A protein has these predicted regions:
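Beta-strand secondary-structure signal
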Residues: 26, 85, 138-140, 174-178
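A structural signal for short hydrophobic beta-strand segments in well-ordered beta-sheet cores
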Residues: 77-79, 141, 215
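Short acidic-glycine loop/turn motifs at beta-strand connectors
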Residues: 62, 80-81, 143-148, 183, ...
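Active-site glycine-rich loop that binds ribose-phosphate moieties when present
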Residues: 122-126, 134-144, 148-165
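Phosphate/pyrophosphate- and phosphate-bearing ligand-binding catalytic cores of soluble enzymes
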Residues: 6-7, 15, 58, 149-279
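Anion-binding (especially nucleotide phosphate/pyrophosphate-binding) glycine-rich loop
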Residues: 1-128
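Hydrophobic, well-ordered secondary-structure segments
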Residues: 92, 96, 110, 114, ...
Length: 279
């Protein structure tokens, strides 16, 4: 078994923020077989492994990673009826575009997310009121402890706001995911994609070196009634959001006057306070 594993590979060029040290070992797994065998290789040598997608939600330590970093580069996307099955390394914008061409709606909101299918499922990525978990029908993942490939239903994935079972169990490596979409006309789907894109350009730091929203919004139900009232009294700008599920972190940071605040080359966007950019 020959695996194209490299040594001492810089990770900074492989992340949006362009920071971080080197990986002791690195492999770009172009096939599912290489992906599985590379994890087996890491376990054989008692090395930790880390799955790196598009690098859009990763901060790499300057100390690097003293194990094996595996980048899934297998990215096949198939359609059967209203179902779309995408491998872990497929980019979300490409999946959204192909779904549009197939006349399948549901992924329009994801057309501007700079991540992979695997990463999107792991973090239950979402925006504009939609989430990856809302569409997922099932997925396949490799259990590196048992050495088996397991199938997960939507319920098995334990989706919640920006969470899934896969964030809590790093031994599970996502291989592919199947999504249930709705039939629609490509022109109508494209209009919605254009509308979402326009909203992004208007409100977000598009084009900057950034990875989207940094912090999760704060759920109201995570605090007591009294604490909630104190916050509303202290920050009157939050009153329009008191009946919503979350407190927008961008509004909190903006209220604190942190838009444009910087340390070194890292800066809080002047356009959207939950976007951190590199100047």
């Amino acid at each position: 078994m020959h695996l194209p594993i490299q040594k001492d590979v810089p990770l900074a060029p492989r992340t949006i923020f362009r920071i971080g040290g080197v990986a002791r070992f690195f492999i770009e797994a172009k096939t599912r077989e290489d992906f599985l065998n590379s994890i087996l290789w890491a376990r054989q040598y008692a090395l930790p492994f880390f799955i790196l997608g598009a690098g859009s939600n990763v901060l790499v330590s300057e100390k690097g990673f003293h194990g094996l970093v595996v980048k899934p580069a297998f990215s096949k996307i198939d359609f059967l009826g209203n179902m779309m099955t995408a491998e872990a390394g497929a980019m979300i914008p490409k999946a959204s575009l192909l779904a549009m061409k197939e006349g399948l709606s549901g992924f329009e909101w994801a057309s501007g997310i700079p991540g992979t299918i695997g990463g999107s499922v792991r973090g239950n990525a979402g925006c504009f009121g939609s989430n990856t978990g809302d569409l997922l029908e099932s997925l396949e993942a490799y259990d590196s402890i048992s050495g088996s490939i397991r199938k997960f239903s939507n319920r098995d994935c334990g989706f919640s706001y920006r969470e899934s079972i896969f964030k809590k169990h790093p031994e599970l490596a996502i291989l592919s995911a199947t999504f249930s979409l709705q039939s629609s006309s490509p022109p109508d789907i494209q209009k919605r994609m254009v509308s979402y894109s326009a909203k992004r350009v208007e409100t977000q730091a598009i084009g900057a070196q950034c990875a989207g929203c940094v912090f999760k919004n704060v759920p109201w139900d995570s605090m007591s009634f009294l604490k909630r009232q104190r916050i509303l009294n202290s920050v009157p700008e939050l009153h329009p959001f008191k009946n919503q599920e979350h407190i927008p972190v961008a509004l909190l940071l903006d209220t604190l006057g942190l838009k444009g605040y910087s340390i070194g080359r890292a800066m809080i966007s002047k356009k959207h306070a939950n976007f951190f950019i590199i100047k």
